[in-house]
Amino acid sequence: MEFKHVSVLLDECINALNIKEDGIYVDCTLGGAGHSSEIVKRLSSDGRLIRFDQDKDALKAAGERLKDYKNVTYVHSNFYAIYDVLTDLGIDGVDGILMDLGVSSYQLDNGERGFSYMQDAPLDMRMNRENEFSAYEIVNTYSEEELYRIIKEYGEEKFAKRIASFIVKNREEKNIETTLELVEIIKAAIPAKARREGPHPAKRTFQAIRIEVNKELEIISKTILDGVKKLNKGGRMAIITFHSLEDRIVKNTFKELANPCTCPSEFPVCVCNRKPEVKLISRKPIEASKEELEFNPRSRSAKLRIIEKL
């Protein structure tokens, strides 16, 4: 299957990075290389782009798309290793870091990857298929309490308890092996009235399982903190999120970096001596325009937040 992915908030991201032609930039989530291709077009031969992806399909497709550019370095790794990878490459400072936290259109549309609740496939959902831990293990081995916790916490699903209970009851007869098997179990757990309203009944549960498989939320804050350490003065970090859990982590981490003072509000002056490391470029997140929403509905939930290193 061809690796296709429509980049979200493309122009907004490029503007946010304030690209210098001789700068060093990091694209933490390569995907279909839409953002990367626009970054590298703006670089001279003295500039450099470092591109991460834990999905080998993405790296292969992007390598073909950007084969004419010799100033691109490809890294098969999760972006949580950003500090160590840059250090190993001999890079002390970069001028911009971009993180797109969404699942690519290719991963959603490629049935065999198991991300979609619209197509039948083995329960997988691994961003990095070299990892052994998949959605199958979660669905078939987690206790009812563990399933309830992740579906409630990561999916923000109000019927989490019923869904967890139905999963455990169904797997007593036989293991749950495919996405559509799981979808039918979720549908059975949710009252008919609720199924008829709002998004697809399996959307939140699939989101929760995907987050758990790939440990998505655990690594966001660490990556931001490690990435900021590598930003040059005036360098920027731009992050696109797609649901409230991610956005909350990014928002709060950015806020702590921009205002780290721990002194009580009644203190007339700061005595903790904790200085801001960054400034917020956008106090409110940037969202997709009406025009973008028309040709790319998946951008509807996207939010872009930006900081600049002081």
UniProtKB/Swiss-Prot annotation:
The keyword Cytoplasm applies. Keywords: Cytoplasm, Methyltransferase, rRNA processing, S-adenosyl-L-methionine, Transferase. One of its GO terms (molecular function) is rRNA (cytosine-N4-)-methyltransferase activity. It is found in: Cytoplasm. GO terms for biological process: rRNA base methylation. InterPro entries: RsmH (IPR002903), SAM-dep_MeTrfase_MraW_recog (IPR023397), SAM-dependent_MTases_sf (IPR029063). S-adenosyl-L-methionine binds at A33, G34, H35, D53, F79, D100, Q107. It comes from the Bacteria. It is an enzyme of class 2 (transferase). Transmembrane segments: none annotated. GO terms for cellular component: cytoplasm. It catalyses: cytidine(1402) in 16S rRNA + S-adenosyl-L-methionine = N(4)-methylcytidine(1402) in 16S rRNA + S-adenosyl-L-homocysteine + H(+). Its EC number is 2.1.1.199. Belongs to the methyltransferase superfamily. RsmH family. Specifically methylates the N4 position of cytidine in position 1402 (C1402) of 16S rRNA. This is Ribosomal RNA small subunit methyltransferase H. It comes from Clostridium perfringens (strain 13 / Type A). The lineage of its organism: Bacteria, Bacillati, Bacillota, Clostridia, Eubacteriales.
